[in-house]
Amino acid sequence: MNKLTRARISVEALLGQIQSGERGGTCVFLGTVRNDGDVTAIDYSAYDEMAREEIVRLIDEAQARWPAAKIIVQHRLGVVPVGEASIAIVAAAPHRDEAFTVCRHMIEEIKKRLPIWKKEIHADGTSTWVDPSGKQIAGGLRDS
């Protein structure tokens, strides 16, 4: 289930696909939409095929580096309200240190490389484009 989705992320479903008797450590990272001031939601958009291919490439690279680990990534697209998860990364490995390391590696690489754009939706109905690091784009590109 390494994919993009427009539905709510089910951690239970992801865990059901990854846990096994060979992996004693499982790390789950959830990135949730937070209320920065007057933000009510974030609208995530992507060129789906390119984003899917990059997720697969990122997982393949991590699997080559940590062959005993299993990794699942799921990223939401569309409008995600405050408090809901926009991304889930689940990494299972024989031991907890490896699971934590893989999970951290994945979120850092995703933030650098995954071509997904976000637009903050504000309580007053306006929206602001945000770069992948979370900073508003210079010039304050704000839609009304």
Model-assigned labels for residue ranges:
Residues 1-85, 92-104, 108-144:
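N-terminal, polar/charged subdomain of small-to-medium soluble alpha/beta proteins
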